[in-house]
Amino acid sequence: EAEKVFDEKTGKTYEIEAKYKTEPVNRISIPLEQDIVNIQTAFTVGTEPSMDCTPTDDDEKKLLDAVKAVFKSNKIKYQNKKVVRAWLSEQEAAEYWYVTDDDSFWAKFWKKVKTTFGGKVKPTKKLKSVLWSPFRGDKLYPFFNDEGKMIAFSREYKKKLMDDSEITCFMTITDKMVYQWDLSKGYEERTPFTHGFPKLPVLYAYRPEPYCKKIKTFRVRLEKLLSNYADCIDYHFFPLLKLIGDVEGFMGKVKDRMVKLTGEGADAQYLTWNQVPDTVRFEAETLTNMAYDMSNTPRISFETLKGVGKASGTAFRFMFMGAHMAVENHGEVIGEFLQRRVNFIVSALGSINPTEFSKASQTIDIETELVPYMIDDLNDKVTTAVSAVSGGIWSTREGIMFAGNADRVEEELAEIKEEQAAKNEQIGNKGQKNAS
């Protein structure tokens, strides 16, 4: 509003024109979909998918070790999360496999399996992979035949040149060839080349809509509710001093000045907001809970879990049952994607190193399966394993694997035999002493 200023020199009062400014309203954004997608991703591939395989000979065992080595060198453990996250939020993702010249991979592999290369031509190619998705700037064009089999795959993307300019590139991959074009003044075809794999080196996952589309209305309403509530707090939360009566004068120093009020009903009090906004709290909690419940996503936070107490593994299984059911549904696409990846790598290793793996790649059977994330209760697992082994239901080997020590099964079995032999020897020595 306009302000009046008294000029002591002229003895006149001037009025300064009011200046108006635009005050921005609160706009609170809530990354609800991002949190749900991250939790779903962690439950789906937070625990590495299992690989079930029983090699029938040494060649198949070497091939299985080679598949695991390819997974490790390509950091598939982390790429799985990128694939699932892109599939849930971006609707589609593709994984492209190619070869590079790198003989160090095979040197490390032969050293690990403690054997020497037995072929005539030592392999020099290494399998590499790259992820394509819309948020990474890729436009994906899968091509399927009438039976639903993908027979070709195309990708459009931008490539930055040395002068910071960008050109559009297009590539098409078939079961044998890779074709590329650059769009500068017109489409210029680059020299096509063969990828050298017996199968199409592209894995593709698609879903018809983003995973969190059904909860978008909850998030929009929640953001509007909290934004309006924030504006309400800014205008009404901080108390105002209400003065009732006639102002007779001021007392005290400037800093601690007091107002003297007179007249009937003279009073001074703060205006405070005494009403508790229960309706706002109720709607916010309801919308948030509905968003997580509709997406079968558990709310993993301190506030949510602090009332659980000392929960056992069984209690956590019931708590995460909805998330595990969602993982089973994800397996329709992601499980198939992972299985096709394993099958492709097996065939690719057979083509890269035919001397060692050509025959084994045609006979080996590797099955992969999603393992939903679970907070393991070690005490429950050990108790179950001990009961099953002592009851004759499981072998000692199976009990060790169930208890979570699968990486050291042979070592543990050998140590158990040694300890048992030592105990039997001690018992025999005591028996001889007692007899004498």
What do these predicted regions represent?
Residues 1-127, 436:
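Extended, helix-rich architectural segments
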Residues 11, 19-36, 42, 58-62, ...:
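Alpha-helix boundary/N-cap detector
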Residues 21, 46, 51, 55, ...:
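Conserved aromatic-histidine-acidic binding/catalytic patches
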Residues 59-63, 72-80, 87, 214, ...:
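Short amphipathic alpha-helical segments
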Residues 64-66, 266-269, 320:
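A short, surface-exposed helix-loop junction/capping segment
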Residues 81-84, 88-89, 94-207:
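Extended, regular secondary-structure scaffolds
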Residues 186-315:
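Extended, charged amphipathic alpha-helical segments
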Residues 247, 256, 261-264, 279, ...:
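C-terminal helix-loop subdomains that flank or include functional centers
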